[in-house]
């Protein structure tokens, strides 16, 4: 016979008290008790992408995967997130498994390269062990791993060229993600995995594209971003940048499948002013008539490039437009109004 309700409640309270004593306060909690913290975020550098993510940026303490074709802007988006984390007083690390980080380009995007922790590991095991130790220190705000495809298992590096090492990298990723996920949640460290695309052989229906490193990352990631270059931006006949589209393929903290478009300028990164113009026109703060852009009677310029230059020189107007967009959409650097979603890893 089941115990009566008062006895059950008393037994549960005793069990919860013992759990708190053994494992720390908050180890088990009722979802409606109000002890949940709102989701803290790291802005991406593009207001359009922040809106598409639903909470104003990349969630802290979660796994993020950014993937796409070569030269699509994956590292650029990750470096902008690093710069924004540092701008808010955070500490960042970059695990450069590809040995391809350009410090000068990172500095142009706003990254404090003097304070950035950089590691160029020899093996995938070393890279992920370093990541685990940095997360467990509790001091890091963001860690970027560039890229999953370059996390080569030690056995493959030490073996002969042509040897078969089926599933080694997938097992390595699965084990590493099992280890770091809990530590990330406790420390609030965001880990961004940059990934490459491969094509599956013999696929007749559906997309043949897949990402490297097995399936574990797909499951553990709270946010997956598919980034593509859709257009080349030109100034006359000279290419000056790319129009980029990002699709939020997976999102555990807000509705998924939203898209964002923004400009990435060569040598400058994501154009903040370009994003503000696009969002301003979309939400009625900036008026576009023909090729002219106007804001509250002030002409910003003829053509998007001239309007972009105007906002770059007139930061007060730029900041005013940004503030209005963020107020209307309910996002910003202090976007913490959304209740924390359960970490369903």
UniProtKB/Swiss-Prot annotation:
Q: Name one Pfam family in it.
A: RecA
What are the annotated GO cellular component locations?
A: cytosol
Q: Which gene encodes it?
A: recA
The record lists ATP as bound by 68-75
Natural source organism: Rhodococcus erythropolis (strain PR4 / NBRC 100887)
Q: What is its main location?
A: cytoplasm
Q: Give any single GO term for biological process.
A: DNA repair
InterPro entries the record matches: AAA+_ATPase (IPR003593), DNA_recomb/repair_RecA (IPR013765), DNA_recomb/repair_RecA_CS (IPR020584), P-loop_NTPase (IPR027417), RecA-like_C (IPR049261), RecA-like_N (IPR049428), RecA_ATP-bd (IPR020588), RecA_C_sf (IPR023400)
Q: What does this protein do?
A: Can catalyze the hydrolysis of ATP in the presence of single-stranded DNA, the ATP-dependent uptake of single-stranded DNA by duplex DNA, and the ATP-dependent hybridization of homologous single-stranded DNAs. It interacts with LexA causing its activation and leading to its autocatalytic cleavage.
The alphabetized UniProt keywords are: ATP-binding, Cytoplasm, DNA damage, DNA recombination, DNA repair, DNA-binding, Nucleotide-binding, SOS response
Indicate where this protein resides in the cell.
Cytoplasm
Gene3D superfamilies, alphabetized: P-loop containing nucleotide triphosphate hydrolases
- State one molecular function term (GO): ATP hydrolysis activity
**UniProt protein name:** Protein RecA
The keyword Cytoplasm belongs to this UniProt entry's keyword annotation: yes
Q: Which domain of life is it from?
A: Bacteria
């Amino acid at each position: 016979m089941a115990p009566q309700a008062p006895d059950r409640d008393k037994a549960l309270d005793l069990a919860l008290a013992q759990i708190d004593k053994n494992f720390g306060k908050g180890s088990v909690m009722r979802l409606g008790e109000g002890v949940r913290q709102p989701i803290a975020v790291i802005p991406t550098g593009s207001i359009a992408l922040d809106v598409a993510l639903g909470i104003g940026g990349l969630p802290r303490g979660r796994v993020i995967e950014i993937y796409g074709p070569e030269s699509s802007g994956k590292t650029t988006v990750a470096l902008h997130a690093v710069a924004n984390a540092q701008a808010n007083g955070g500490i960042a690390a970059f695990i450069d498994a590809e040995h391809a980080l350009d410090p000068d380009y990172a500095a142009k995007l706003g990254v404090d390269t003097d304070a950035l922790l950089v590691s160029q590991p020899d093996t995938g095991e070393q890279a992920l062990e370093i990541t685990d130790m940095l997360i467990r220190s509790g001091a890091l705000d963001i860690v970027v791993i560039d890229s999953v495809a370059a996390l080569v298992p030690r056995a493959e590096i030490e073996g002969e060229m042509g040897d078969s090492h089926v599933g080694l990298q997938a097992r390595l990723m699965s084990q590493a993600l099992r280890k770091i996920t809990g530590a990330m949640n406790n420390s609030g460290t965001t880990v961004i995995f940059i990934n490459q695309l491969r094509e599956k052989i013999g696929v007749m229906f559906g997309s043949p594209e897949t990402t490297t490193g097995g399936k574990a990352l797909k499951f553990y990631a709270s946010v997956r971003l598919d980034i593509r270059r859709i257009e080349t931006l030109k100034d006359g006949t000279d290419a000056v940048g790319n129009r980029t589209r990002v699709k939020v393929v997976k999102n555990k903290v807000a509705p998924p499948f939203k898209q964002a478009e923004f400009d990435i300028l060569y040598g400058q990164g994501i154009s903040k002013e370009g994003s503000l113009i696009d969002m301003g026109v979309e939400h009625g703060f900036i008026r576009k008539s023909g090729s002219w852009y106007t804001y509250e009677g002030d002409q910003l310029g003829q053509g998007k490039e001239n309007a972009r230059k105007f906002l770059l020189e007139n930061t007060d107007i730029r900041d005013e437009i940004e503030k209005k967009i963020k107020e209307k959409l309910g996002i910003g650097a202090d976007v913490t109004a959304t209740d924390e979603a359960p970490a369903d890893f």
